[in-house]
Amino acid sequence: VSNYQDITNITCPDKKTVVIKLSKENVAFADYMTIGILPKHLLKGKKLATAEFNQKPVGAGPYKLISWDEGQSITLEKFDGYYAGKPHIKKIIFKIVEDSDARLLQLKSGDLDMAQIEPKQAKSLKKDSKDFDIYRMNTADYRAIAYNYAGSKLFKTYPELANILSYGIDREAIIKSALLGEGQVAYSPIQKNKFNSSDIEKFAYNPDKMEQLLQQDGWTKNKKGIYEKNGTELKFTITAMANDKVRVDMAKLCAEQLKAHGISVKAEARKELDWEKQDATIIGWGSPFDADDHTYK
């Protein structure tokens, strides 16, 4: 709702024109308007999360929903009335296959015509078969460690650790190992965005600097070789969703790198994440759009 507080007046001079007046300039407003408009006559007085409208959505795109088998598949059929012309593909079935190994098997068996696979799988597929075309997609997608500043006692007490620990993560090594080189070192959530600035601290890999900053902040190594401060060991767990093997690999690599420098870190693959209590997790996001609306709002 806060996105639209600048609106002072809305008029419709004709059936195909809407004029919106704002109280002040807002460069992000054009992106705010990309959010779909909900039909009041279908949703008034109903719970948005459970309304039938959400199970039978109607849009303005080239395809229309035919069926939805929850947790299994979504079937779309071409919409002949699409304003840009009839689609060439008559029907599209999106199969929901969370496990990457299962996706690869279904791709090989012919149950799937197309699938998003992991770099290690792409390498084996390219080696074993000439029946597949592999496409590389340039995206704004990134991975990062998200620290829990509210629910984790360690990071709630010492939030400055997030920046300090960044110097102990060798992102080049992670790209080579977990992604087989299919990626680049990230330093910002809007790195692939037109609003990005490269003139910021990039936290380049420098474990010596990390340890120096820890010591300046009052952390000292105990008899076990683990940094501690005020009786608290620098000890935490990095989680990742078990069905995302790339994130699990990344969590393990981050843990190994930090453990080599006196930080007790454990990596865990979990079926479900406890967002309120966990210390840290490997997240994925992408922000090619207006940063004010998409990342920081």
PLM segments and residue spans:
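Aromatic- and charge-enriched surface segment that lines or borders ligand/interaction sites
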Residues: 1, 19, 106, 155
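Surface-exposed binding/hinge segments that line
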Residues: 2-43
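Gly/Pro-rich hinge or "lid" segments in bacterial periplasmic/extracellular proteins
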Residues: 15, 34-87, 91, 207-212
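Ligand-site clamp/hinge motif
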Residues: 54, 79-125, 255, 264-266
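Short helices/loops that flank or line small-molecule/ion binding pockets
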Residues: 101-111, 127-129, 252-261, 271-281
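Append "and occasionally in soluble cytosolic enzymes with long acidic Gly/Pro-rich linkers
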Residues: 157-255
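Acidic-aromatic pocket-rim loops
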Residues: 272-297
